[in-house]
A protein has these predicted regions:
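Residues forming the flavin
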Residues: 2-51, 57-148, 152-520
């Protein structure tokens, strides 16, 4: 017998397995423990003084549970199949490659960085302020920027594709069960390396190719049709199509496209800072209690407001996380956030960013479609020039001092491993960002009383939340509007944002590639 239950319980009732089973047993009227269950959905309702958990459960009495998967996957042998070049191994590239295999095409994945184990060593040196590798860092390398992040899988992009399918692929490759039922699923930076390594194994086992240290430096074009790519080591890779999934930080790709007179466009994006609070403070604000206890997860938040005609909002909020260095160039400071699966650090951080439109950048119009990219680069260099001279040290300021416009005499404890130095960020941040941030922080404190705290620190700069460039594609075929066979994909194309939407875009592009090749 199978039955479904919708339960609203206290966190301790859900978190204690014996208590939870007892409640299920009572609900189904089963006199024995001869049942198993699977959680279908779990969310937290923290609107009242006593947070509750809403749990949807499927119960199996006297029979084995059915599979948790709603989708079927058929990875076939594509060793001798038609090759398709996939540039980049982030979520968009990986999911494009896996879908191509299902559709009968051989992906040739070219990754400019290193495999994930070597990448971890380079990142460790970067965290210790000892070395910086332009091709192996928090943005570049196996799995892309998402590998060393919180691994958040929540997305509002429900029309882009099959979200459940993406979650199941991650789960099949080693992600935890909870991503299939949590309202806001995440994998965690400690588990993501295993997942992306398993995805690589699937690709290679099926006959696909996966090549590291393969930085694309040129495109092979004939009569406005792409035939392949050249890499920095002099190798050439040909394919029936090229999927360009290079991520939002591959500035050299944008420059290459512009150099070859391939159309790119300026688009709106966002930049700002990363704000860090003690996790206990965010817990008190969000859960309305002094201590969240052992059964509630580290509290998160999502806030947004319109300030002077532009959005100011939280981005990539990492409860129980750390701030990390995310620059891809020397002489520049970029920060981002990440969390382990347990989200068990003492800090809560989030990007707080300001919407920027191309028309806001009147001083950069000489850079054409790359005006936002140039603005982004200059702000990252300004942050480096105000970081006290360290390799990856970041400028910082107490949140209250930032809002009132004074230099901080001291800084709160901060999770950023390379270290922070007090800097008058209110002074050197561009007015279109700094002014809106100050007003935004004051408004956020009205929604989350206590957010504007002297215990909070602002760290700069959060500049890679989205791409300032779009590589335009045909609305029907998803090919580039000018170059046949070139399929821009993922965050770097300007058509996705975040792991899940990038993964869905990767699958979409693989299907569009197959449609094109099946017609010829």
């Amino acid at each position: 017998m199978q039955t479904k239950l919708q339960l609203t319980l206290l966190p301790q009732q859900v978190g204690n397995e014996t208590t939870f089973r007892s409640i299920i047993k009572q609900k189904i009227g089963c006199g024995e423990d001869d049942f198993s269950y699977r959680i279908l959905r779990k969310s937290i309702d923290a609107r009242s003084r006593q947070p509750r958990m809403n749990v949807s459960v499927e119960v199996f009495v006297g029979e084995n549970p059915t599979t948790p998967y709603e989708n079927e996957f058929h990875y076939r042998d594509v060793t001798t199949a038609t090759p398709v070049v996939v540039v980049g191994s982030g979520p968009a590239g990986l999911f494009a490659a896996l879908r191509l295999i299902e559709l009968g095409y051989k992906p040739v994945v070219l990754e400019r960085g290193k495999e994930v184990s070597d990448r971890k060593r380079d990142i460790a040196l970067q965290n210790r302020n000892q070395a910086f590798n332009r091709e192996s860092n928090y943005c570049f390398g196996e799995g892309g920027a998402g590998t060393f992040s919180d691994g958040k899988l929540y997305t509002r992009s429900k029309k882009r594709g099959n979200i459940r399918r993406v979650l199941e692929i991650f789960h099949r490759h080693g992600a935890q069960d909870a991503i299939l039922y949590e309202a806001h699923p995440h994998i965690g930076t400690d588990r993501l390396p295993v997942v992306v390594r398993n995805m690589r194994k699937t690709i290679v086992d099926c006959g696909g190719e996966y090549i590291f240290n393969a930085k694309v430096v040129d495109l092979i074009l004939e009569n406005d049709t792409i035939k392949g790519v050249k890499t920095a080591d002099g190798n050439t890779f040909f394919g029936a199509a090229v999927v360009l999934a290079t991520g939002h930080s591959a500035r050299d790709i944008y420059a290459l496209l512009q150099q070859k007179k391939i159309v790119v466009e300026a688009k709106g994006f966002a930049m700002g800072v990363r704000v860090e609070h003690p996790q206990a403070l965010i817990d008190r604000i969000q859960y309305h209690c002094k201590w969240r206890g052992e059964y509630l997860p580290a509290a998160s938040y999502s806030i947004v407001n319109q300030i002077d005609g532009r959005g100011v909002y939280s981005f990539c909020m990492c409860p129980g996380g750390h701030i990390v260095p995310a620059s891809t160039e020397s002489g520049a400071i970029v920060v981002n956030g990440m969390s382990a699966a347990a989200r068990n650090s003492h800090f809560a951080n989030s990007g707080i960013v300001v919407e920027i439109r191309p028309e806001d950048l009147t001083d950069y119009h000489q850079f054409g479609a790359l005006c936002g990219l140039e603005f982004q680069k200059q702000l990252e260099q300004t942050a480096f020039n105000n970081n006290g001279g360290g390799l990856q040290t970041a400028p910082a300021q107490r949140l209250t001092d930032f809002v009132t416009g004074k230099l901080s005499n001291s800084l709160p404890e901060c999770s950023y491993l390379p270290g922070v130095v007090s800097s008058p960020m209110h002074f050197w941040l561009p007015e279109i960002i700094g002014s809106r941030l100050r007003k935004g922080f004051r408004s956020f404190d009205r929604y989350m009383h206590g957010f504007l705290s002297s215990e909070a620190v602002v760290v700069g700069v959060e500049s890679r939340s989205s791409s300032p460039v779009r590589i335009p594609r045909n609305a029907d075929t998803c090919e580039h509007i000018q170059i046949k066979g070139l399929f821009p994909c993922g965050e770097g194309s300007g058509y996705a944002g975040g792991i899940t939407s990038s993964a869905m875009d990767g699958e979409l592009i693989a299907e569009k590639v197959a449609e094109k090749l099946n017609r010829h």
